Amino acid sequence: MNELVFFEIPKQNLKIQIVKKSDEILEQIRKESAETAVMPDVAQYYTDIYFPKAPSDRPYTFSSIVLSSDGKMAYGDNPSGPLIAKNNFLDPDGSLGDFWVLNVLRAYADGIIIGARTLLSEPGITCHVYEERLTRQRREVLGKKYQPCGVIVSLDGTDIPFDHYIFDVDPKEEYKLVIATSPRGAEYIMANSPLKHPVIGPFKTIEDVDHADLGELYTDFNAFPVIVTGQGENPDTKV
């Protein structure tokens, strides 16, 4: 089985330029935030980070995007996400800063959304927190689980590679992975996947989700729950 890879990113040469900072706005967000703890490495090498409290009807989502100086986020002949930053040969330290910030954002997240086609283009991707110190501070300072939950999203399940590296991570790593799809996607997964997939749902309304028992998601790391929303082959993103 596969093990998660960890390493410590050297921070002495991190190039992180804060373009604009408003202490007033930051303090307002901090007061309204569900969590106000700041990981020590983030405070030392970056700045305090706070996230707005999630609305009652949906999670708070954010993204990390790396662009080249001419505005490109991927190559036409190779859509793999990390290539733009990784191939910054003129300024490797800048590339390192991009990767560290990505790990910071992952460390603050409860879940990481992974498109099924991303798995197809990146055979070794896991979307866990690679930085060892951030992994530890995430648990000790933020009180979060060892790793954020991976959430694979697919309309109909047909584009999910069930032999991907991510589905064979050793349970001792405590890396949880779930799939979010439509009713038709769930049918396809149950008929074609060799893996263990407890089905949660289908959910047609937000109220259905509120009454669902999702507590067992983290009890079996050999299982990959399928969370079903919507109707037919159309999942309901609002749910």
Each model region followed by its residue ranges:
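Active-site ligand-binding patch in enzyme domains
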Residues: E3-S69, A74-F221, N234
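C-terminal folded domains that constitute the principal catalytic or ligand-binding module
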Residues: V228-T229
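Short active-site-adjacent structural elements
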Residues: P235-V239
